[in-house]
Amino acid sequence: MGCFFSKKSRRKSPKKDAALPTGDESATGNDLAETNNTALGSNSNQEAPKQYSWDKREKVDPKDFMLTGLKNETVGRLPGKLNGQQFVIQDCENCNIFVLDHSATITIDDCVNCRIVLGPVKGSVFFRDCKDIKCVVACQQFRTRDCKKMDVFLCCATQPIIESSTGMKFGCFQYYYPELAFHFKDAGLSIFNNNWSNIHDFTPVSGETNWSLLPEDAVVLDHVPLPDPESEFKSVRIATEAGRSIVPLTKGSRRTESEESCLFVFFAGDYTTANARKLIDEATAKGFVLIQTKEVSMRPEDVSRVFQNNAESLTEWITKGPVVALELNGDGVVEACRSFANEVFNGTQLFVSESKNTSSRDVDNFFNFADMQMGL
């Protein structure tokens, strides 16, 4: 079916202060000084009261984690300002909003005509009662309710959900700033798990289409501009080109131009992510298209089901961590990927489809397993 390549204390009671003489009127000044020094010395040896985590916790000002009632402004948060906290955006109009940090959850309510960039969100991003929004979002869960006309460049680990929303358009996340890769890691998100085009409409209307995909050549800057040069974000090096994006640009559920696809799997190692990015660069430079990617953990029984005849040789490789899989598409892609495996990744632990006769089955076996594993 395919081929693979490998290389080998309890708290102490505080001491009591030494008692100063009170009844001995003959005590000299030197005696008193010495006694005082002794007392001070005893105090200095006392053990400090035990501190608990809630004693050390910094006080949080809720206003630092909200943007409310703003109009015609460029606002947001710089890297390092949220550090995994929750964030709220509400009642903003005609604003450019840049939240360039990782967070726990973000809710956006009653905003109109805003351009928004949200750094990686560990939990959910929830838009409610918003209109005319253009945004770049990376999150675990994405949901909208009662929204109209949104253009979303999305990276979402689970299936995005829209509810009572119309005029929704989606594209693949394309964004870069220097801290973004670290923010993905801090938020527990994989750049390879992106279901941006797999939208679930919770309230479909017969005969109407509430959502669609943005044109394949859609450019982020045409929807979400860079920060104002006079704003606090002017020092952040932002890029929106697909080749610079932290998240790989995938075709998603759009129709493929070729019937030939290839499964390419990297097993866990020190350079798995770098190798996957290199393969994408090599393949796209030759005109092939990246359809989808996944990063998942596998068990021995999963290997048997997915890789079938090659399972025995691959089982030991899955113990080192998750695998990263890519589907590449285009006429001649299988032969090209096998050449990449031999010439570029020789000695790397990987699996690549053996022939175009079995490659479609390889792709279906792996990504059906991955979707089940992730509950999609």
Curated annotation (Swiss-Prot):
Belongs to the TBCC family. GO terms for molecular function: GTP binding; GTPase activator activity. The gene is rp2. This is Protein XRP2. Residues 49-204 form the C-CAP/cofactor C-like domain. InterPro entries: C-CAP_CF_C-like, CAP/MinC_C, CAP_C_sf, CARP_motif, NDK-like_dom_sf, Tubulin-bd_cofactor_C_dom, XRP2. In the retina, detected in both rod and cone photoreceptors (at protein level). Has strongest expression in the retinal outer nuclear layer (ONL) and weaker expression in the outer plexiform layer (OPL) and inner plexiform layer (IPL) (at protein level). Expressed in all tissues tested. GTP binds at G123, S124, Q140, Q141, F142, R143. It comes from Danio rerio. Acts as a GTPase-activating protein (GAP) involved in trafficking between the Golgi and the ciliary membrane. Acts as a GTPase-activating protein (GAP) for tubulin in concert with tubulin-specific chaperone C, but does not enhance tubulin heterodimerization. In the retina, required for maintenance of rod and cone photoreceptor cells. May have a role in normal retinal localization of the transducins GNB1 and GNAT1, and the rhodopsin kinase GRK1.
